[in-house]
Every structure is written in structure tokens, then in C-alpha cells.
Amino acid sequence: RAEGAGRAGRRLFAAGLAFGWIFLTRPLDGLILGGLTGIWVLAGPRGSVARAAAYAAGCVVTGALLLLHNLAMTGSPLRMALSDYLDGHWAPGANAFGFGPDIGPPGRWGALDLWPGHGPAEAALNTINLTASLQFDLLGWSVGSLALIYAFFLWARGKRVFDWAMVAVAATVILVMAFYWFADSYYFGPRYWFLAAFPLFYLSARGYDALRARFPAGEGAHVRIDSILALSCLFGLLVFTPWRGAMKYFEYGNFHTSYRRALAAGTFGNAIVLVAKNGEPGSAFMLNDPWFAADRPIFLLDTGTLDEAALKAAFPGRAIVRFDAGWQARDARG
């Protein structure tokens, strides 16, 4: 028994390390999922204080790295670098979590923020938009990806403890994210809800079981509904996924591959390349080597005000060339 308890403790500690790492990379996600997992470890089946302590210890070991990072970047272990940056460029508290009149970007940030500040009405509207996107993006079914989840709530009999745990996880993710001002439903769908992906897939499977049980018994009784499911899955795999991955965001935001192709062809050598404003300059900037390797070019935006003498002094031995990609947008959305 002691050996088994020790093995379980090591696994819980490892799980804590993983959730602490999530907290390090995406703090809010780590708090949500790590906190819910901690409650399950403490109060769920076979839960105990000892198990929760092993899990919490792992969380602290890796999660504390975020506090050290914050301290190095902002001077305070509790102040995030992103919040510090946006406080300086937007307004103090602009990236805060919750409701308030000064939360969010100035000037609506290209119409991505509906109203100044963030309040319950905007949170409700964001949630509605994200749900509408989820019914298409979750499974890639144009007939509605949430249908199986509806079936779970309507017809699933003998709901299990784990079923309700998954409902709680999904609901918590949706509720907590409503308090953040940026929903991003306009660009990439409900990506801030991705923590709810597994619970939603699980509930969809349970909903399909419930739907299947409602069909009459007998030989071949489930052929039709199984065929519908298979056809819908094939549509999601063979039609929706290629479109979503390769077509929907092709040259979206005026990003294009002209600079990448020219770089691959050896056009630039190790020159300092002043690119004309043609599409999104980030298409070129993303190709910059962060260490300014001697055999790689350096891309800069040609603003007409750059001090070329200073550039030559900073990067001796590099030619300065101007490059116009000659690219034109094919999608009016940009």
C-alpha cells in the first residue's frame, strides 16, 4: 500500500509540474484548469489532503517560474509583462481582468472591441458570438456541431459524476473568459475556450450514445444514424479542415509569402533589406533572425527616414537594398 501511495504521489507531483508549466505560459488557463484539477484531487473520488499536497507542490515548482519572470521583467512578481506593456501604450489597467470603464484598447482596436470599457452586456454578447462560432468550428459540421451536446442534456440517462465534472469544466471556462475584454471570435473563433475542447468532445460522444439509444432496436437499427455520423465526420475531415487550415486565412491580414519566396531564392544574401509598405510588413519581419546571424538578411520597413549611415556602421559589411514585393491583396477583407 505504501509503495502504491508513493507511486500515486509521484504521478500527482508530475501532474502538478505540468499544470504549473501551463500557468507559466498561459497564466489564466493554468489557474482555471489547474484549480479545477486541484479541487478534483482534493474532493473527488479517492481525494485527500495528501494527494492534493503532492499535486500542489508540483504546481508551485514550475508555476513559481512565472513570478521570477515577472520580477525580472517588471520589478514585481505579480505584474505581468504584457500588462505592463499595455499600461504604457494604452492606459493603466487596460488589460485588467473583470469589468470597468477603462478596460480594453483605445479606439476600439480596429472594431474588435465593441464598446469602451468592458461590462456584463459586452461579456454576454461576446459569449453569444463565441457560441455561434463554436457550433460550426467544434466539429466542422455546417448542420451544427453542438447538436450532440444538446442531445446529451435532453436524452442522456443515468448521468455520471464524470459527466457533470466535464460540464463544470466547460461552464467554468466559458464563465471565466467572459470577464476578459477580448473574445477574438471575429478572427479565429472561440480559441480562448480551447480548454473546454476535451469536455465538449466528451459530452458530444455521450450525447451521441443517448441519441443512438433512442433509435428503435432491431437488426440494422443503427445503420442510418451511424451513417449520418460517419458522413458528417468525413465532411469535417475532408472539407472543413482543409478549408479552415489552408483557405480561410490565406493571405489574411495582408500577410503574404513574397518575401519568403525571395529569401529562399537567395535574392537578399545577408543584406539589410528595406521593404516597401506592401501588404503587412510583418510578412518580412517574421523572417528576421533574432540573433542577426551574419549570413542572414535583416528586414526593415522603408519609412524614408532611416539613417543609412548608422545602419552601415551598426552592421558593417552588409549591403543596403530596397525591395518592393509588388504584392496586391486578392481579398477585400485584408
Stretches found by the model and what they are:
Residues 1, 25, 31, 141, ...:
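Hydrophobic/aromatic-rich transmembrane helices and adjacent perimembrane loops
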Residues 17, 56-60, 170-171, 201-202, ...:
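Signature aromatic-anchored transmembrane alpha helix within multi-pass, membrane-resident enzymes
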Residues 21-23, 29-30, 51-144, 236-240:
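Membrane-lumen/periplasm interface segments of specific transmembrane helices
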Residues 220-280:
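Membrane-embedded, lumen/periplasm-facing catalytic core of multi-pass transferases
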